[in-house]
Regions:
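Conserved alpha/beta core of the MobA/IspD/sugar-nucleotide pyrophosphorylase nucleotidyltransferase superfamily
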Residues: 2-5, 185, 206-325
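Conserved core of the sugar-phosphate nucleotidyltransferase
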Residues: 142-228, 232, 236
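Conserved N-terminal catalytic core of the sugar/cofactor nucleotidyltransferase
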Residues: 1-12, 16-20, 34-134, 141-145, ...
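Conserved beta-strand termini and adjacent loop/short-helix elements that scaffold enzyme active sites
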Residues: 108-110, 166-167, 271-273
Length: 325
């Protein structure tokens, strides 16, 4: 039985929606207090999700702007920094943890921004002929259980030995944000589906006609959760799109390649994941991420008390220009 040893995390986006913060710090390096109470760049939290789910090697697909920042973060402390942290055991433990991560890390550069599918294709030599976990470099996950979101997905792959995507039930009004699948439950499983159609960010009318899933409430669909376990056949499908310049909105899309893999006869599954995803690439999503991590942390009681105090105060005036963000 094949086990998933490798993960690919795409971190090549420019983070334009987080301007002006991303003028000086790349989106993936934005700081968050994790559930252990330690402040880390978001990308470290995402890498730890993979490693603590059983992954052994991680490839980050980066761009020429963020590569140096990421390499610097995962480099050993300089002598001067070691002196600064002398006697601070928690910091030295974190430094040791970062060195352990660095030993498992490979960076691959996407030469130009040509879409999510192209970023994944850039990792083909790292992946080789193995199945791999694919994650987004701007999504943080919480499960609220002792099984991380990535581990839930890996368990399904190991049981069925075929491509599988994490999904969540999502209402019609959010379909424009996510790839969406249609499928039927596998046997008596309450959460695993045999996928028979995949569509990137469908219109509501298309979804109602073509993507309804038996058993889901009306107006709810199975949408991508931001992580997948894929087989090397995805690179054949992506390579075909790149060789034939099959772009959508001027980019090479992963979703179309996933559908091409399925159409060629490979079984494709989806699993409803227990947990939540948070997008740090938008201002409100970033705020949501920090709130979720804080509420799930060792500072939970203090955070809840602070929220109660804040909610007791009338909200500040929000300028008209920012009300839709």
């Amino acid at each position: 039985m094949a086990r998933v040893r490798k993960a690919v995390i795409t971190a090549a986006g420019r983070g334009t929606r987080m301007y002006p913060a991303t003028t000086t710090i790349q989106k993936e390096m934005l700081p968050l207090m994790d559930t252990d109470g330690i402040c880390k760049p978001a990308i470290q939290i995402i890498i730890e999700e993979a490693l603590e789910s059983g992954i052994e090697e991680v490839c980050l697909v980066v761009n020429r702007h963020n590569r140096a920042q990421i390499e610097s973060h995962f480099a050993p402390l300089a002598d001067e920094e070691m002196r600064v942290f002398q006697g601070k055991d928690w910091a030295l433990l974190q430094s040791a943890r970062i060195r352990q991560i660095a030993c498992r890390l490979t960076l691959v550069e996407q030469p130009s921004p040509e879409g999510y599918g192209h970023a994944v294709w850039c990792a083909r030599e790292f992946v080789g002929d193995e199945p791999f976990l694919l994650m987004l470099g701007d999504h943080v996950y919480t499960s609220g259980t002792d099984r991380r979101c990535a581990r839930q997905l890996l368990d399904v792959y190991e049981a069925y030995q075929t491509s599988v995507s994490a999904v969540q039930q999502t209402p019609t009004e959010l379909l424009h944000l996510f790839g969406t699948v249609r499928g039927r439950l596998v046997g008596q499983s309450p959460r695993v589906y045999d996928v028979d159609h995949i569509r990137e960010k469908p219109l509501a009318e298309y979804a109602e006609a073509n993507l309804r899933v038996e058993g889901l409430l009306w107006g709810m669909y199975l949408c991508f959760f931001g992580m997948h376990v894929l087989t090397p056949s995805i690179f054949e499908a992506l390579g075909y799109a790149i060789d034939h310049d099959l772009r959508e909105n001027n980019e090479f899309q992963l979703t179309s390649a996933q559908e091409r893999v399925r159409e060629r006869g490979e079984r494709y599954l989806a699993v409803e994941t227990v947990g939540d995803r948070y997008d740090i690439g938008i201002p409100f999503g970033y705020a949501q991420t920090q709130a979720a991590l804080a509420v799930g942390s060792l500072y939970r009681e203090q955070m809840l008390a602070a929220l109660v105090r804040m909610l007791a105060v009338p909200s500040l005036h929000v300028p008209e220009a920012f009300r839709d963000r």
